[in-house]
Amino acid sequence: MKIFLICILALSTAFGNLKAQTATLLNGAWEFNEGEKLHHLFFQDGFYFHTVQQGNQFIGTDGGHYEVKDKSIITKALFDSIDSTGVDNIKEIPFSVTSTQLSLSVPQGEANFQRVDNGQAELAGIWRITGRMQDGKITAIHQTGTRQTYKLLTGTKFQWVAIDPAKKQFSGTGGGSYTFKDGKYTENIEFFSRDNSRVGASLSFDGKLENGDWHHSGLSSKGAKIYEIWSRVGKAN
């Protein structure tokens, strides 16, 4: 009986480790070409963001929380720019993943994503804006109601979203690739929901990590001076 229990515990531990390894394999940025459409799929710290663009044209985005269960990804949407009734919906998506490819079994068929990065970087994670410099003083930002602004960063990709899950409301998003080196944070915009003409633009900021928070300052896309503080969001699962 003792040996049997030890075997069960060993199998349970091994299964738990395999699940964790699979979830870690999902982390990062993935891309899938569907004809002229490009799908971006980001997994980081229990959150997922999925965006579709065609050339410079933004098509749509959705995202929320996820977890791995057996051979499926279980998602719960926080936002959906195309169909707001999809918010709060739970989906179970069968998948397989290797170090370079992610295959998802979706109603339209098999979607084979190629890895862009593995989600490893100093800034990789989910962030929410918590402070802003005003009149020379840093003022805490307390987002009212259920409005939320998130920024997800993988190893090389970023995306921000402005949403209100309680109202199933989507206000905007933008994303692309980024670099963070020698105190300089640079974004290269690849999609932007509010203005396609922003695609191809680059924005550079002075950036630093201080007490776990991310400080960055410079000029916004509209040319206004900004100094923002972003704080990490705890893992969703």
Task: Give the ranges of each region predicted by the language model.
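Beta-propeller blade signature
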Residues: G175-K181
